[in-house]
């Protein structure tokens, strides 16, 4: 476990504790300013908030004779030539590298992109990648994050270039939107972003949602409506109505119709059963290692979900 804050994903920490109780050896590597209650771990190492220790672990794997045919391996090995692995790093490299099955768990919006790249290098060089219980578990920030990726929504900031109109659903980003000619916001509260909007459409929260979420391990989790929010449209109905105005038909009567289309369009979901893991093991399509320079280990990203932030503020903080 490397780059982890329990407050962000308490259920994952519980799963790790259960794994330790079942006999798994759990090792925590975290920046010193982010100490965690991991009493169940076999080993805990708190390090500087940089990549030096992870590089020591990577060098420790090379010293064990680990290698890879992946593109970029020679460059990574050369970048680690002057690194000397300390005793803690050697111990962790040996434990991880020699294990029959091993997983690395880290939080997507907690570690830096450079740290994530180095973690991927470590996994590929060790050979622990792409088979059941043998790879990387990148813990997402939100309950719908994995589902969005599966639906093909992967565009980055470059997608905003030249955009003049924006439809924002459930997000409250700290961004300069002054260059837009039109802004629509759909949210549960009058957020700062909503105050700048030309049109605001009341949205519904998770508490009044019907359907499923796809969690980090690709397990379909059903949700049932618990609260009746007095709004004209549910979230999916807002999208369908907007599409209709642009003469794009979304012929759905309910969430079941959406599920049927997902089954038809997305192979991973075709035979997925609620509560079961599906498509959880993905081997790299083309493993490409990347030499990483100096960077921070952790640099947590602020959430752009207003309701999530409100709830987080009211939760009791660990002592």
What are these model-predicted stretches?
Residues 115-120, 255-319:
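Long, low-complexity segments enriched in small/aliphatic residues
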Residues 1-273, 319:
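Non-catalytic alpha/beta scaffold blocks inside enzyme catalytic domains
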């Amino acid at each position: 476990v490397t780059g982890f804050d329990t407050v962000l994903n308490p259920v994952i920490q519980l799963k790790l504790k259960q794994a330790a109780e079942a006999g798994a050896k759990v090792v925590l590597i975290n920046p010193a300013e982010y100490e965690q209650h991991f009493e169940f771990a076999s080993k805990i190492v708190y390090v500087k908030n940089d990549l030096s220790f992870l590089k020591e672990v990577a060098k420790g794997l090379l010293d064990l004779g680990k290698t890879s045919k992946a593109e970029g391996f020679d460059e990574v090995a050369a970048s680690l030539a002057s690194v000397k692995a300390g005793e803690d790093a050697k111990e962790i490299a040996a434990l991880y590298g020699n294990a029959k099955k091993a997983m690395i768990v880290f939080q997507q919006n907690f570690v830096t992109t450079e740290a994530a790249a180095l973690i991927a290098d470590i996994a590929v060089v060790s050979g622990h990648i792409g088979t059941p219980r043998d790879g990387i578990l990148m813990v997402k920030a939100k309950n719908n994050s994995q589902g969005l990726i599966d639906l093909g929504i992967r565009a980055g900031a470059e997608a905003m270039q030249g955009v003049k109109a924006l439809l924002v659903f459930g997000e409250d980003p700290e961004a300069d939107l002054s260059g837009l000619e039109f802004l629509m916001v759909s949210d549960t509260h009058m957020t700062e972003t909503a105050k700048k909007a030309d049109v605001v459409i009341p949205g519904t929260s998770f508490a009044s949602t019907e359907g499923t979420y796809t969690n980090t391990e690709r397990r379909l989790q059903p949700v049932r409506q618990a609260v009746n929010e007095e709004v004209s449209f549910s979230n999916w109905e807002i999208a369908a109505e907007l599409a209709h105005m642009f003469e794009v038909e979304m012929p759905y009567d309910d969430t079941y119709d959406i599920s049927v289309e997902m089954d038809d369009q997305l192979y991973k979901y075709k035979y997925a059963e609620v509560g079961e893991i599906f498509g959880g093991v993905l081997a790299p399509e083309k493993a490409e290692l990347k030499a990483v320079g100096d960077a921070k280990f952790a640099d947590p990203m602020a959430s752009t979900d207003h309701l999530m932030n409100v709830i987080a503020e009211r939760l009791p903080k660990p002592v």
